[in-house]
Amino acid sequence: MSQQHDEAVKKCRGRPKTFDRDAALDKALTLFWTHGYEGTSLSDLVAATGAKAPTLYAEFENKEGLFRAAMERYIERFSAERNAALQDESKSVAEAIEGWFRATAACFTNCDTPAGCFFICTSTALSSSSSEIAHMLRQQHDAQQQTLLDFLTARQQRGDIPAQVDILSLARYLACMLQGMSVRAREGAPKADLDNIIDTLMAMWPALTGQCMKQR
């Protein structure tokens, strides 16, 4: 009986641990979000994920590959949830925009995640050696603005926004609002402060859409 027990223990000890990719990505995402790409070392990632360096390399190739996967994880978990507010065609343009910004404020100030926008937070303090990472982040900044532009374009084509409104300028303005909210959240502003910014934006909305006119 004792011999069988010893053999079972040996087999259990020799069995390799299963690598939990999703759990590792969530931990890597938090590290990159908090410290940035260059502020996060491979040893930090190994310690946080509990995986050995060879395991991480086998799964993601290198640190850049892990960052790319973490970025996709962020899009999957947070960006898609926020963008859903723009897809409800039963809402007016103002209601959809407000819903998008409210969801954004909730994401930026969620106590379970680092403050601010992952893309904006990780794009600061990048050196020239991280040009590929910088390029990926610029693409994501552009994608956020494009999401707003696509929404405004569709609503303008539907007749919900006057044809003379310059929706590109409006999308750029809203994207800048997003970046400002991220910075404020990163500085420690509570959700109430971001909600106040959104209140001001929505109070200005009628005038804002009237001012963003196409130049003849």
What are these regions (language model features)?
Residues 69, 83-115, 167, 171-174, ...:
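Hydrophobic alpha-helical connector segments
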Residues 76-79, 91, 95-99, 131-157, ...:
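Amphipathic alpha-helical packing segments from all-alpha helical-bundle domains
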Residues 115, 120, 163-184, 197-204:
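Hydrophobic alpha-helical segments that form the core
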Residues 16-18, 29, 33-35, 43-48, ...:
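Recognition helices and adjacent regulatory flanks at domain boundaries
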Residues 2, 23, 27, 31-65, ...:
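Helix-turn-helix
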Residues 107-110, 150, 154, 174-191, ...:
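Amphipathic C-terminal alpha-helical segment
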Residues 95-97, 110-135:
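Amphipathic alpha-helical segments used for helix-helix packing
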Residues 1-19, 211-216:
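N-terminal intrinsically disordered/low-complexity leader segments
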